[in-house]
A protein has these predicted regions:
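Domain-level signature for soluble enzymes in the chorismate/prephenate branch of the shikimate pathway
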Residues: 2-284
Length: 284
């Protein structure tokens, strides 16, 4: 079984946030191109604990959405626990209204789903004033509960794979307000793994800078001079030091030597410099 540029033994478990049928599970299926052993976690904190305890060898974590932006707490988790990003995957998010078979939308009293899923489908839901919206922990878990308890009059918003897995009927497909809705996921390991440099053309970095004029501009100039393309920059406040920020950046490059040169310069210019991952660029 191959994951990007990494091979993974069949018995390696992968931690996901949510359960089978969730978007995290869908990423595993697309990235692996086949089923894999899954560790289902109710939160991202539990996912990280699972990885650190060696209960799973890999983890899949959502990190950014094209509409909602960065999932900032997940950046902090990766940094705090020194996790390594070994790959990425971009998933088109399609939300579907589903319920037990044989029902019409007019018979649905409540829709249960994750708050983000409800928000992404608000235009459709506003046209269904008879339906009460109920926030839940996970899209797929809601679908599973409807199936297990045979809950009539209750619908879920989840993926097509959840409908298939839990034998639900899709009452309205792709009800998300914005069709071009994509989430970026990263593949994580507990420990660093050596990767052939010819396979690497993207890196995720973290550093801190003194709060003085031109410090960030100088770093960005180095990246530009070394022929790196900045695809993401995210600042995160340092809780213990008010008004000081850590910067998380993603860069792509054609030649690893250019990246190596930039990395050596940034290690001198910035404090607390850290490589969060070096991997293959999968951005569409």
């Amino acid at each position: 079984m191959q994951i990007g540029i990494f091979f993974c033994p069949m018995d390696t478990k992968i931690a996901i946030q949510g359960i089978k049928g969730s978007f995290h599970h869908q990423v595993v299926l697309e990235y692996y191109h086949q089923e894999a052993a899954i560790c289902e976690c109710l939160s991202f904190e539990e996912l990280v604990d699972n990885l650190l305890a060696n209960e799973s060898g890999l983890a899949v974590m959502a990190i950014e959405n094209s509409i909602a932006g960065s999932i900032i707490p997940n950046y902090a988790l990766i940094d705090k626990h020194n996790l390594q990003i070994i790959g990425e995957h971009y998933l088109d998010i399609h939300q579907n209204l589903m319920a037990l078979k044989g029902q019409q939308i007019s018979e649905i009293r409540e829709v249960h789903s994750h708050p983000m899923a409800l928000l992404q489908c608000m235009d459709f839901l506003k046209n269904q004033p008879h339906i009460k919206l109920v926030e839940d922990k996970d899209t797929a878990e809601t679908a599973k509960r409807i199936h297990e308890n045979q809950l009539k009059g209750i619908a879920a918003i989840a993926s097509k794979s959840a409908a298939k897995l839990y034998d639900l009927e899709i009452l309205a497909p792709e009800i998300q307000t914005i069709n071009n809705n994509m989430t970026r996921f990263v593949i994580l390991r507990k420990d660093k793994t050596e990767v052939p440099t010819e396979k690497i053309n993207k890196a995720s970095l973290k550093f801190e800078l003194d709060h003085k004029r031109g410090s960030l501009a100088a770093v960005l100039n180095v990246m530009s001079d070394c022929k790196m393309n900045l695809t993401k920059i995210q600042s995160l406040p340092k809780i213990e030091t008010p008004w000081k920020y850590a910067f998380f950046v993603d860069v792509t490059f054609e030649k690893y030597d250019d990246y190596r040169k930039a990395k050596s310069l940034l290690q001198i210019m910035a404090s607390h410099f850290k490589v969060l991952g070096e991997y293959e660029n999968k951005q569409p």
